[in-house]
């Protein structure tokens, strides 16, 4: 079963890498993430193309995997116990209305984290999917969450909302954005 994999990411650092044409930075990442880069064909090439600012065409999925490596390199993976094996349709059908009712739907939604946009321009991929929430939107969502109490819901929904709030708290504490991958 698929699930959501979230990362706390200093978005500006990822954006600075893309198009930097810095071979030392690229080689450092390739050395540190050698095993992960070898898992799928084309990821190392996609990473190099991202560094060179050549992100048009090619296998979109390789670019998404390369982006995940950049998110892990510059940021950190966040706990995801409640969403590790969550169905995307269930998340959008059940959890997104909770976020809308709570008033945070303008800033964070499961649909946005599963079918959203990436923090950098890369070719489209059917899989893996994902999206991001910028640092300012993270702060705004937390302001709303901190002001109002969450209505009563079943344990599964509360667990997902708790995970998401934990991600937002961690990101806000470091002035970072949230990038999620769904696979």
Where are these regions (language model features)?
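Conserved GNAT acetyl-CoA-binding A-motif
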Residues: 178
